[in-house]
């Protein structure tokens, strides 16, 4: 067997293994998360202790949906979009909660991460407009719902900002952090705080998504996530090229998703290491 045939045979074996392993690994990972949930509880939506577990639970649903799309719908396009979203989620978790060694840096990133999305939502708020097709009562309810939504977002924003300004890190790096929380920034992807305040948000001090993908250490897949799958996410021209949704092509996507799932479980086990030790000890 020549080298080319050996490589093709190895790829076929990997694809075949993925179809066998994927549902089993997913079922086992859900079991792992269930055990973890029983041990630590769910916490609030912005609790730094339980938030990574919440994200992992959400991703198991996405992994399940991906399996159904590949096996039943054979939708190559949607499969790519879901995998890219999964990669984005895991890359964010990895940067915020694992790559960061210092606890206060981790807390800072966590709060900035939420502030970034909250500020975006607040900036896109649109209040209902009264017209003849809606009653005064219905309009009042819609208006109250929107006001309540804004109120809740503002309360969460104030809590997050308060968390940041009470960090010891805020005392030692006040100017830098003030730049990070300046309206329009909330830069949770900063590389270092030990830099001139005026340069804290410069592109040379910000992790790109491509760099964040590389931190997952999935053997060059950062190019696949950042370039190839971007075509599907954004509906670019090359995403409309016909690719046969056969077992081999879909299997390649499944093997990448399986690698992401394994990476996510490793991350969760590392982040909750002491909790898993308790789980193991309780089973003895």
Name what the model sees in each region.
Residues 83, 103-114, 120-124, 128:
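Intrinsically disordered, low-complexity acidic/Ser/Thr-rich segments used as protein-protein interaction/activation
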């Amino acid at each position: 067997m020549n080298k080319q045939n050996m490589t093709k045979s190895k790829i076929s074996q990997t694809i075949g293994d993925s179809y066998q392993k994927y549902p089993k690994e997913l079922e086992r990972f859900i079991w792992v998360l269930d055990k973890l949930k029983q041990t630590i509880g769910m916490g609030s939506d912005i609790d730094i202790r339980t938030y990574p577990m919440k994200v992992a639970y959400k991703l198991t649903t996405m992994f399940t949906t991906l399996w159904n799309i590949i096996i039943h719908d054979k939708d190559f396009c949607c499969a790519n979009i879901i995998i890219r979203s999964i990669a984005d989620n895991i890359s964010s978790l990895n940067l915020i909660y694992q790559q960061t060694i210092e606890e206060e840096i981790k807390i800072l990133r966590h709060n900035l991460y939420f502030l970034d999305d909250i500020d975006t939502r607040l900036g896109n708020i649109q209040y209902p407009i009264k017209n003849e097709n809606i009653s005064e009562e219905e309009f009042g309810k819609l208006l109250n719902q929107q006001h309540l939504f804004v109120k809740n977002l503002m309360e969460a924003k104030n809590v997050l900002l308060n968390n940041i300004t009470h960090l010891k890190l805020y005392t030692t790096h006040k100017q830098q952090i003030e730049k990070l929380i300046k309206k329009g920034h909330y830069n949770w992807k900063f590389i270092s705080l030990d830099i001139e305040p005026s340069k804290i948000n410069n592109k040379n001090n910000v992790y790109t998504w491509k760099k964040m993908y590389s931190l997952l250490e999935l053997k060059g897949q950062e190019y696949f996530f950042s370039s190839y799958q971007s075509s599907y996410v954004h509906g670019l021209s090359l995403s409309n090229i016909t690719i046969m949704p056969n077992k081999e092509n879909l299997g390649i996507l499944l093997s990448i998703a399986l690698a992401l799932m394994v990476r996510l479980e490793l991350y969760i086990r590392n982040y909750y290491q002491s909790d898993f030790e308790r789980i193991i000890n309780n089973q003895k």
